[in-house]
Swiss-Prot record:
InterPro entries: EF-hand_12, p53-like_TF_DNA-bd_sf, RHD_DNA_bind_dom_sf, SH2, SH2_dom_sf, STAT, STAT_TF_coiled-coil, STAT_TF_homologue_coiled-coil
UniProt xrefs under CDD domains: SH2_STAT_family
Subunit text: Homodimer. Does not form heterodimers with other family members.
Cysteine pairings via disulfide bonds: none
Function in brief: Transcription factor that regulates gene expression during development. Required for optimal cell growth.
GO biological process: cell surface receptor signaling pathway via JAK-STAT; defense response; negative regulation of DNA-templated transcription; positive regulation of DNA-templated transcription; regulation of cell population proliferation; regulation of transcription by RNA polymerase II
Name of this chain's protein: Signal transducer and activator of transcription B
UniProt keyword Isomerase present: no
Family classification: Belongs to the transcription factor STAT family.
Gene expressing this chain: dstB
Length: 1148
């Protein structure tokens, strides 16, 4: 093989033979290093050899002696290169020893020539000395040997190079290069072995990872199977629950039917008994007419002589008369005993049934929930085939049956003697007392809203069984009664009023139920072109003060438990209570007068027991909700509006609020009638009645559009009044009530429009929503503090013809920066993803009232950030669709973990509510919101506050912090709150400070010059308490104090030397003292305690709260001794013992 090295001017061709093989070289051929490694070594050697050859050629031109050495060195280098080339030639054909590779080597050599030229220039500068040239050549040889990678000793190579050229030196260099190559190959082999081991370990780990992934996949498949099984079990459970509810519903209806049948049977039995008694009484009356007419309370007078058909002597006739009289008396006594026993048995049965109902426990432990579960849903709960309440059934059946028994007893008592009359009257009086006690218990129960329907509509086919036979028999028998007996009977009957005929309803078929749901006074005329007259016309049969109907309150009466029923709203005692009394005594003048008295008594009893009193607060309970679902009176906006005390002066704002309130009451009745008309229209359309549907639809839509525009105009007027006029606290309360009620009415109207326009489709909105009817927000609430049960309430609103099969509990969620913070969230200052944020956040909807109460408790703080509440309910329709019913978000609030966070959190809430993403707001709008927050911070009632902010206070704040401008900006608010917030913090959390403020002992907003003017003419020791203007949140005491000045005066006398005298002058001035933290430090040292210990303060100026004017003048005050008015606020400390005379000296 020939290798050509291109120098600067010379080129040498070296013919080398194959080196002698050795065991080491043969062994290394088995495992060769990678080709990339050899290529790099080859390139390095070639570049170094080229450099050395060029340097040697340059040195040859300068010194002939050095030519030999340079040639020898070049030969050695060429031999090494030839050995390396032979190694490369022996590589397998798969290696990169191709001509292209050799061409790359030559290219590297050509590239290195340029570097050699630079080296030649450097060497030319050093050619003056031959010895230096030799040394340079030797160094170059050493570098060449090192670059070849032989790994041998540099000293040996240098010795070989410096020796004269010979064959032995050439062979030695070849052997050293082969050894270095062997060492390199050995190192490469070791590296490859370690790489192979690492690859095997990697493959092992990959196999383990694959096995783990297979296990995870198996677990996932098992979990999916378990989930599918659980879902199947849940579906089966749901089906079983539905079947169970259906069976309970059927059982409930069957029990109702049996009870109705029992009542009918009892009434029929009473009728039969009455008929028998009437027959006996008629016979006795025909035989003993004169004796009965002369009967009185003192005894039985002997019967007068009557012409009998005699078959013998008068004695026989007298005996026969006595026998007949004894037989009749025995029969009457037996009948009386039977009736009394029946009455006692019936009362015992009723007591047992009531005790069973009281002892009956449902799944949730609530009686109303038991009824709802038995019915399956609150929609089926409102079916007209059910009675209104269980207590009503007990009361009606007992009153109705007992009235018949009383008639029977009265009829039988006509022919009794004196003893019989007295015993019967005693029993009746006892029964009367029991009934009065029962009525008193009913009076004490909560009132419940209901509809009053036409008596005739419920009487025909649906009401109580007719009592015509009883009334007729009692009327016939009472025609022959005397004055005393008639008076007793009428008094007893007069104290008991018959139940309203619409209380009990007969079980009917679903078709009959649909007909029964349409009251006579509210029948929709299909032929009529509009329902405007129906909506605007008054309904005589239906109460004008009733509440909106809904899916929970159908046209018929709603069943309810006795715990939620009050007889004042349940029964109409004035309808037909006196007909029987007026018909009982139509033959006696005295009886007629007694009946008139009884009628008056009945009317008075009716007024006391119930009736609709327009002036009483309870008269508007039927108007209690602004939505169609029944609510408790506590949610009644109309009643709450009336409880708010009117303003001191009747202002145009007060008149406007009262006018909108009256319009709202009319709109409630309009929406109520609209509900009934729309429900009838939708039911007729679903049943296939297509007469004038389009005309009725257009009429409903036009009426709803008009009502919607009216409601929106009312909201606009209220908001305008809120932002343009400074209102009094009571007016603010009324305005908030009206805003809440009108907005709920508007939501209800939108549901009706949605239902009418869209209907129920799978892709269409469902006419149902949740509304927050009561909330304490916006407010700052402490962590772990639970809200009261009635402070946060949510109500379900639905359309007119909505059928809901079941529903889930309502769930409350936190909304923070438009993100829901559920139980698994950690955005509220916790890193535990499973930690709950709210306690009692899931509540069940009341199936009767449609309201859910949330006494929630917050378990984490919100880091001074505003959050809101959002409620979600899932309902299942009759079509099987599951729909999520959301609510709008609540007002913002902040949960704090420490009281020191209250100031900043309250400022954030106040700023968010006032500006509401605006740059500036009007001054009246800011004042109205500030007034509400101030009353809440000082824990005053918004309906009738003790001491709200006055006009003088607002003027002070406007001039001090806002420059008297009509608008408030963000910058002005920040400067205002930096002082006002700390003052409110002190007012809220310092002991006795809030009470002192409300009682007028603290002047909060006073300038220094105004204080000086107030105290200018006061006696020494008079003081006032106010908040410091220079130190926010600290209290200042301004008082009238004294200053003493000493003056020196000299006096001379002829006999004595001149003397100097000191005179003291006292002057008064107004002083100001800043209360320090040490003055009121400790749990039992308050501001009143500090004032009691300071002798400089004797009399305090107290504001007259009742006379605070709503003007910009200084409030009126009065001067009071501090120990008299502040004594209740002093801490009760143990008095120090009197140590005088006990051997101890006091410490001065």
């Amino acid at each position: 093989m020939e290798v050509t090295n291109n120098g600067s001017n010379n080129s040498s061709t070296i013919a080398s033979t194959n080196p002698p093989t050795s065991p080491s070289t043969t062994s290394t051929s088995k495992s060769l290093p990678p080709l990339s490694f050899l290529n790099s070594q080859w390139e390095n050697k070639q570049s170094n050899n080229n450099n050395n050859s060029n340097n040697n050629n340059i040195n040859n031109n300068n010194n002939n002696n050095n030519n030999n050495n340079n040639n020898n060195n070049n030969n050695n280098n060429n031999n090494n290169n030839s050995v390396k080339m032979e190694k490369l030639i022996e590589l397998p054909s798969s290696s990169n020893n191709s001509p292209e590779f050799l061409n790359g080597v030559n290219n590297n050599n050509n590239g290195n020539n340029n570097n050699n030229n630079n080296n030649n220039n450097n060497n030319n500068n050093n050619n003056n000395n031959n010895n230096n040239n030799n040394n340079n050549n030797n160094n170059n040889n050493n570098n060449n040997n090192n670059n070849s990678g032989s790994g041998g000793n540099n000293s040996n190579n240098n010795s070989n190079i410096s020796s004269p050229p010979s064959s032995s030196s050439t062979s030695t260099s070849v052997l050293s290069s082969s050894q270095s190559a062997y060492m390199n190959d050995k190192m490469v082999a070791a590296t490859l072995d370690s790489i192979g081991k690492m690859e095997s370990i990697q493959r092992k780990y990959e196999m383990q990872i694959e096995s783990l992934m297979d296990q995870i996949q198996g677990y996932i498949e098992k979990e999916q199977k378990l989930r599918s099984q659980c879902q199947a079990v849940e579906d089966i459970n749901a089906k079983l629950e539905n079947e169970n509810l259906q069976l309970k519903k059927e059982l409930f209806e069957m029990s109702r039917k049996f009870k109705e049948i029992d009542i009918i049977n009892l009434n029929n039995t009473n009728n039969n008994i009455n008929n028998n008694n009437n027959n006996n009484n008629n016979n006795n009356n025909n035989n003993n007419n004169n004796s009965i007419n002369n009967n009185n309370n003192n005894g039985f007078s002997p019967p007068p002589l009557v012409k009998y058909p005699s078959n013998g002597s008068l004695q026989q006739d007298a005996k026969r008369f006595k026998i007949m009289e004894q037989q009749s008396q025995q029969q009457q006594q037996m009948q009386q005993q039977q009736q009394i026993q029946q009455q006692k048995q019936y009362q015992q049965q009723q007591q047992q049934t009531t005790s069973k109902r009281k002892n009956n426990i449902s799944i949730d432990g609530d009686k109303e929930a038991l009824v709802a579960e038995a019915l399956g849903s609150f929609v089926d709960y409102a079916k007209p085939s059910l009675k209104r309440s269980n207590s009503e059934e007990v009361f009606n059946s007992s009153v109705y049956k007992n009235k018949n028994n009383i008639n029977n007893i009265n009829n039988n008592s006509n022919s009794n003697n004196n003893n019989g009359n007295n015993s019967l009257l005693n029993d009746i009086q006892n029964w009367q007392q029991q009934q009065q006690q029962q009525q008193q218990l009913l009076h004490q129960r909560k009132k419940r809203k209901d509809y009053d329907y036409d008596y005739n509509s419920t009487q025909n086919g649906k009401g109580i069984p007719s009592n015509s036979s009883n009334n007729n028999s009692s009327n016939n028998n009472s025609n022959n009664n005397n004055n005393n007996n008639s008076n007793n009977n009428n008094n007893i009957i007069g104290s008991i009023s018959p139940p309203h005929s619409s209380q009990l309803q007969q079980v009917s078929s679903p078709q009959q139920q649909q007909q029964q749901q349409k009251p006579n006074g509210l029948k929709l005329s299909i032929s009529s072109g509009s329902i405007k007259d129906l909506i605007n016309s008054p309904n005589k049969e239906q109460s004008s003060k009733s509440q909106y109907p809904s899916s929970l309150s159908q046209s018929s009466s709603i069943p309810d438990m006795d715990t939620d029923v009050d007889s004042t709203d349940e029964f109409d005692f004035g309808s037909n209570s006196n007909n029987n009394n007026n018909n009982n005594n139509n033959n006696n003048n005295n009886n007629n007068s007694n009946n008139s008295n009884n009628k008056k008594r009945n009317n008075s009893n009716n007024n006391n027991l119930g009736g609709d009193d327009d002036d009483s607060p309870d008269s508007n309970d039927r108007n209690g909700s602004s939505s169609p679902i029944d609510m408790e009176p506590s949610y009644d906006g109309a009643n709450l509006f009336k409880t708010v005390t009117p303003g001191t002066i009747t202002t145009p704002q007060e008149e406007l609020l009262n006018e909108i309130h009256s319009l709202q009451m009319q709109q409630r009745e309009t929406i109520e009638k609209m509900y009934i008309a729309q429900k009838q229209f939708l039911s007729d359309r679903s049943n296939g009645f297509n007469n004038n549907n389009e005309e009725i639809l257009r009429s409903l839509q036009s009426d709803q559009t008009k009502l919607g525009s009216t409601l929106e105009s009312e909201l606009q007027a209220l908001n305008q009044l809120y932002s343009q006029t400074i209102l009094e606290p009571n007016q603010l309360c009324k305005l908030d009530i009206l805003l809440q009620d009108v907005s709920i009415q508007l939501k209800q109207l939108h549901l009706y429009q949605m239902e009418l326009n869209y209907g129920y489709g799978s892709n269409e909105p469902f006419p149902a929503t949740l509304v927050i009817i009561k909330q304490p927000f916006p407010m700052v609430i402490s962590k772990f503090k639970q809200l009261q049960e009635d402070h946060l309430c949510v109500q379900l609103l639905t359309g007119a013809n909505v059928e809901i099969v079941s529903y889930s509990p309502i769930r409350a969620e936190l909304v923070f920066h438009s993100k829901n913070l559920t139980k698994g969230s950690s955005n509220l200052g916790t890193q535990n993803s499973l930690k709950k944020n709210i306690e009692k956040d899931t509540q069940v909807l009341d199936p009767i009232k449609g309201v859910a109460k949330f006494p929630i408790k917050f378990l984490t703080g919100t880091r001074k950030s505003c959050v809101k509440l959002h409620f979600v309910l899932q309902i299942k329709t009759s079509d099987g669709h599951i729909i999520n019913v959301p609510s709008s978000t609540s007002q913002p609030f902040i949960v704090i973990t420490n009281d020191c966070q209250w100031e900043g959190s309250e400022g954030t809430l106040l700023k968010k509510e006032t500006f509401n993403e605006k740059f500036e707001i009007s001054w009246p709008h800011f004042v109205n919101i500030l007034q509400k927050h101030f009353l809440k911070a000082t824990k005053q009632s918004p309906i009738q506050p003790t001491r709200p902010l006055s006009m003088y206070d607002f003027t002070y704040l406007s001039n001090t912090f806002f420059g008297g401008k009509p608008f408030v900006s963000h910058k002005d608010f920040d400067s205002f709150w930096s002082w006002f917030g700390k003052s409110i913090q002190t007012l809220r959390y310092k002991r006795h400070i809030s009470t002192l403020w409300q009682n007028g002992f603290i002047f909060m907003f006073l300038k220094r010059d105004v204080v000086t003017q107030i105290l200018k003419n006061q006696d020494v020791g008079t003081f006032v308490i106010l908040f410091s203007e220079a130190f926010p949140g600290q209290l200042e005491i301004s008082y009238v104090g004294t200053d003493q000045k000493d003056s020196l005066s000299k006096s001379s006398n002829d006999l004595q030397s001149p003397t100097t005298t000191t005179t003291t002058t006292t002057s008064t001035r107004v002083k100001h003292y800043l209360v320090q933290a040490n003055d009121t430090s400790g749990s039992k040292r308050t501001l009143p305690d500090f004032l009691s210990e300071c002798n400089q303060f004797t009399h305090i100026l107290q504001l007259n709260i009742a006379m605070i004017p709503q003007t910009e003048t200084i409030p009126v005050f009065k001067r009071e001794p501090k120990n008299v008015v502040l004594e209740p606020y002093y801490s009760k400390r143990q008095n120090s013992q009197n140590i005088l005379g006990s051997g101890y000296d006091p410490l001065f």
